[in-house]
Amino acid sequence: MDFSFSSEQTLLQDSVERFIQNDYGFDQRQKLTGSELGFSKEHWSHFAELGWLGLPFAEEDGGFGGSAIDTMIVMEAFGKGLVVEPYVSTVLMAGSALAHAGTTAQKESHLAAIIGGEAQASLAYIEPQARFNLNHVVTRAVPDGSDWVINGFKGVVLGAPSADLLIVSARTDGDEQAEEGITLFVVPANAEGVSRRNYPTIDGFRASEVTLSLSLIHI
């Protein structure tokens, strides 16, 4: 059994490691973590130009149809450089949720913007009472005509300070610990009724506590 990389994967590895070596020295990273934004928009645009933001997504969704090994190559190099750009929160968490659960219209709009580097997104799913039980969702969404009204709180939403979109888990049926009845909603981060308390994490990333109060979401 051959575990060596393909020629394309070797080129990808060389490309990402070259970026880390040339553009992500310790002093450069320190400047980024100390900035107001916490990362570099120029780096993010560079990721889009090189196709890294579209790497794990299917070709029919505008991505490059990369494998888990391709993503591992990028993440291994990012780990070496302690990269603080919100790749995990936007691409691997929120982006994957959109790719697997989003409608065709949501993919064409939001996923395309993520792949192009034009938008960032965060997956808002952690609630303080849940501990590690992902079924324990108190945030609730109730229908209002063709809209949904969402009320609740999400903690440690990685990448949320810079996010344009929040992928929010909310209960639409059942009691607060039921396995069924949880729905994901695409919520504009600047929507009325959405507030964020932003803070830096110990490893240099940014996160938010997100409160949704009578947030009206059109579906």
Model-derived features with residue positions:
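Buried hydrophobic positions in well-ordered alpha/beta secondary-structure cores of metabolic enzymes
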Residues: 9, 20, 51, 58, ...
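A short, Trp-centered hydrophobic/proline-enriched beta-strand micro-motif
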Residues: 117-126
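A structural signal for short hydrophobic beta-strand segments in well-ordered beta-sheet cores
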Residues: 139-141
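Intrinsic disorder at enzyme termini
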Residues: 1-8
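Internal helix-loop-helix
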Residues: 49-108, 112-117, 159-165
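Conserved small/polar residues in nucleotide/adenosyl-binding loops
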Residues: 217-219
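Short secondary-structure junction/hinge motifs that connect adjacent elements
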Residues: 27-50
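A short core secondary-structure module
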Residues: 151-195
